[in-house]
């Protein structure tokens, strides 16, 4: 079967022929229909410092997908051949304190598909049946293909009460863009998104952001004054940029709450006085809550949330290089690849 493989320890991804995997007793074989390129996949493609210490060459990458059940393991019940599914890409152990305590998204033994084990950029893949998420008929496959990052956005946006609140989102990648839309959809007052990429800031505005700010051209403090704000009640840090995080700390209202998804450089510093003397709450966000986030994000789409606005490109798998080029250049929202 075709698969996108990190063949060499260099920049690039290669379309190769690999064997079709065989599902174990509790696993399901999935025939992939559509997959989406994630920022993580771009890191692996670029072969940056994180990838070099994390990824083993020869890996089939990818973790954002939708497909149909092609084969059931001998112990699997509750699913049918041909059923359309996505899946939680974090495979957890099921027996640690957090898994047994109802917090599997915090499992210290988590294995990520497309990072630690072979992933979804292939014609077929296997997944534990317990990780599957059935996709309702009303949701098109090109949207279901990126439920994984949509879930990251939902986890962040729903971590704190944003109804009637002023929200600052630093980083207008696809997750930040989606989070901006969720915050407005559920009743935030002002949602301000910052970045230095005008293409993606426009997507955030289209998704419903009150104001978008290119911080290389405009002062965030000036925007706050224009909106008659004393500070932000909720911050969602999506950029992984320490300067953006420190700007957020500077602009938070006393008692504000921050959800952090962006991964900061090792050794990145911050002004701890701002956190302490403003009484800020800072909450790390990892993955999606299993499976509360999946329920909520599915119902958001079914209730009219415009997830489609972040989808900018759909390409056949043979044009995968164009998709990675668009991502590298920052000239795309979500890029979906078709395996049909």
From Swiss-Prot:
Keywords: Cytoplasm, Metal-binding, NAD, Oxidoreductase, Zinc. Gene3D superfamilies: Medium-chain alcohol dehydrogenases, catalytic domain, NAD(P)-binding Rossmann-like Domain. It comes from the Bacteria. GO terms for molecular function: L-threonine 3-dehydrogenase activity; zinc ion binding. Its cofactor is Zn(2+). The lineage of its organism: Bacteria, Pseudomonadati, Pseudomonadota, Gammaproteobacteria, Lysobacterales. It is found in: Cytoplasm. The record marks 148 as: Important for catalytic activity for the proton relay mechanism but does not participate directly in the coordination of zinc atom. Catalyzes the NAD(+)-dependent oxidation of L-threonine to 2-amino-3-ketobutyrate. GO terms for biological process: L-threonine catabolic process to glycine. InterPro entries: ADH-like_C, ADH-like_N, ADH_Zn_CS, GroES-like_sf, L-Threonine_3-DHase, NAD(P)-bd_dom_sf, PKS_ER, Zn_alcohol_dh. This is L-threonine 3-dehydrogenase. Its EC number is 1.1.1.103. Zn(2+) 1 binds at residues 38, 63-64. It comes from Xanthomonas axonopodis pv. citri (strain 306). The active site is at residues 40, 43.
